Design a protein with these regions (language model features):
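Rossmann-fold scaffold of SDR-type NAD(P)-dependent oxidoreductases
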Residues: 8, 80-89, 136, 186
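Conserved glycine-rich cofactor-binding loop
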Residues: 11-12
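Conserved glycine-rich Rossmann-like NAD(P)H-binding loop of the short-chain dehydrogenase/reductase
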Residues: 26-41
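Rossmann-fold cofactor-recognition segment
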Residues: 48-64
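Catalytic Tyr-X3-Lys loop
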Residues: 97-116, 160
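Catalytic loop of short-chain dehydrogenase/reductase
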Residues: 107, 127-128, 133-172, 179
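Amphipathic alpha-helical dimer-interface segment in Rossmann-like NAD(P)H-dependent oxidoreductases
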Residues: 110-130
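C-terminal helical subdomain
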Residues: 165-231
Length: 231
């Protein structure tokens, strides 16, 4: 049985392109998302391309659900070779100074808690694989850049910015922690709008999902630099 890539946060755009890219390279593909209709359509589309695929419904904010879905994927598809974390909560929070401080921690439920839960659950497989990897989709709102901070405030996306910045740090920590155990950890940061996934905005780069998937494949194969940027 081929190695499996687990894609958490499946939908149109990046995760579809990643599924097709890795599937074309011989991976079986496990899709995880909340929407059963989206999952069903995704599996059918991949199978039409000759790719082995299966789907599991789970909420990326729920560690137990994510662990359960990964266990089911392992039982059905075999050894997990790659985790692709594409899940995104979209919690902007608006003005942080007006937000309930007790609610701010929820922005990390997907970006940190969910991601870490998935890695922990798949870790034994990833270590046993000769080229195990964790690949993370991130966004430029997390950049430590005053101009980007201004954009995030204007877009009422301060919560997203916090989550993205924390996610980038977690990628670095996991990369350092797992490097000597043979597991590669890397991220692709999207600095723009993925074509077909939202309205295009003047002055904001439009990027192709296929280019992002190719960047993930490049990181996976090279296993050197842990970060790439598109846009």
């Amino acid at each position: 049985m081929s190695k499996a890539i687990i894609i958490v946060g499946f939908g149109p755009g990046v995760s579809t392109a990643v599924a097709e890219r890795f599937g074309a390279e011989g991976f079986s593909v496990a899709l995880i998302a909340r929407s059963q209709a989206r999952l069903t359509a995704g599996v059918e589309a991949l199978k039409a391309k000759g790719i082995t695929a299966a789907a599991y419904s789970a909420d990326a904010r729920d560690p137990a659900a994510i662990r359960g879905a990964i266990n089911k994927a392992r039982a059905e598809l075999g050894q997990i070779g790659v985790i692709h974390w594409n899940a995104y909560s979209g919690q902007g929070l608006g003005d942080l100074l007006a937000a309930d401080p007790a609610s701010v921690g929820s922005v990390f439920d997907v970006a940190i808690v969910g991601l870490l839960s998935a890695v922990q659950e798949a870790l034994s497989d990833l270590k046993e694989s000769p080229d195990g990897a964790v690949l993370v989709t991130n966004g430029a709102f997390g950049d430590l850049n005053p101009m980007i901070d201004g954009f995030a405030i204007a877009a009422k996306a301060e919560g997203i910015a916090l989550a993205n910045a924390a996610k980038a740090k977690l990628v670095g920590l996991l990369a350092a922690r797992l490097k000597d155990e043979g597991v590669f950890v890397g991220e692709v940061t999207i600095a723009g709008i993925v074509r077909g996934t939202g309205p295009e905005i003047p002055g904001v780069p439009v990027v192709e999902a296929k280019s992002i998937a190719d960047a993930f494949w490049g990181l996976y194969k090279a296993r050197g630099q842990i970060r790439a940027r598109i846009g």
